UniProtKB/Swiss-Prot annotation:
Its EC number is 3.4.15.6. GO terms for molecular function: peptidyl-dipeptidase activity; serine-type peptidase activity. It catalyses: [L-4-(L-arginin-2-N-yl)aspartate](n) + H2O = [L-4-(L-arginin-2-N-yl)aspartate](n-1) + L-4-(L-arginin-2-N-yl)aspartate. The active site is at S132, E150, H174. Belongs to the peptidase S51 family. The keyword RNA-binding does not apply. InterPro entries: Class_I_gatase-like, Peptidase_S51, Peptidase_S51_cyanophycinase. The lineage of its organism: Bacteria, Bacillati, Cyanobacteriota, Cyanophyceae, Oscillatoriophycideae. The keyword Hydrolase applies. Exopeptidase that catalyzes the hydrolytic cleavage of multi-L-arginyl-poly-L-aspartic acid (cyanophycin; a water-insoluble reserve polymer) into aspartate-arginine dipeptides. This is Cyanophycinase. Keywords: Hydrolase, Protease, Serine protease. GO terms for biological process: proteolysis.
Length: 272
């Protein structure tokens, strides 16, 4: 069986397969340690945390995980819970569910629980997965909401502070499924130094310790690199006026493709 890095961060575009092959969740489970996995599930983004937490417990239990715990954080004081912190200290993986990314950040940001999660991820001690809202929070800057399907403009996107787990990225999810290219470009117009990552449903960008992003799943991962952006009218036009952005680099990556975050170069996957 292929060995996967425990230090991986799996950023999922939402609506991942939970019934049939469950390819993305299987990858998370393997990275977590398979039958030896110790998995913390954080459903705090959801309006129904008990239901969604139990659903993922059932999925990972069916795969063979024996040690799972739902960290049901519903107010900020629970971010100081010693039992939760002790479980995060010993677990091999943490999974953040979908829901509302503002709610998730409001509950977890700057808590002792989140600080320890961030430290363990940075040290490569634990696998982290996040889907939908759990993916949106990964960067320092976060897309908190907005609209779809228009020309890029500043009014199209609402920004907030994320959890800073992968600080250099801005993530959008349900990407092509909800026509969100324009709002990702709108976000990047004010933060061209960040790497824009748009992830389709049932698709995952696997951030690996070796600086590579690997794509798995049924859709694509869109990468917008604004590092060489030569011009934007972001500060010169009204909020609802169209934005101009010059000299962006665009990559559309499919299953098996990779992207090097250091060299900013894509690599084609091996066709089997």
């Amino acid at each position: 069986m292929k060995q996967y890095l425990r230090s991986s961060v799996l950023v999922i575009g939402g609506a991942e397969d939970k019934v049939h092959g469950k390819e993305i969740l299987q990858r998370f489970w393997h990275c977590a340690g398979g039958t030896d996995a110790i998995i913390a599930i954080i459903p705090s983004a959801s309006r129904e945390p008990t239901i969604i937490g139990d659903r993922y417990v059932s999925i990972f239990s069916e795969m063979g995980a024996k040690d799972l715990k739902v960290l049901d954080v519903r107010d900020r004081i629970q971010g100081e819970d010693k039992d939760y912190q002790e479980y995060v200290e010993k677990c091999t993986a943490i999974f953040m569910t979908g829901g509302d990314q503002l709610r998730l950040c409001g509950l977890l940001a700057d808590t002792p629980l989140m600080e320890r999660i961030r430290q363990r991820v940075k040290l490569g001690e634990v696998t982290l997965g996040g889907t939908s809202a759990g993916a949106a929070v990964m960067g320092h800057h976060m897309i908190a909401g907005g609209s779809s399907g228009e020309s890029p403009n500043r009014a199209l996107v609402d920004m907030a502070m994320g959890l800073g787990i992968i600080p250099e990225v801005i993530v959008d999810q349900h990407f092509h499924n909800r026509n969100r290219m324009a709002r990702l470009l709108s976000a990047l117009s004010n933060h061209p130094e960040r790497l824009g990552i748009g992830i389709d449903e049932d698709t995952c960008a696997v951030f690996q310790k070796d600086e590579y992003i690997e794509v798995i799943g049924k859709g694509t991962v869109t990468i917008v690199d604004g590092q060489a952006m030569s011009y934007t009218n972001h500060g010169k036009v009204a909020a609802e006026d169209p934005l101009a952005l010059h000299n962006l680099r665009l990559h559309i990556l499919g299953h098996g493709d990779r992207y090097n975050r250091k060299t900013h170069q894509p690599m084609a996957g091996i066709v089997e």
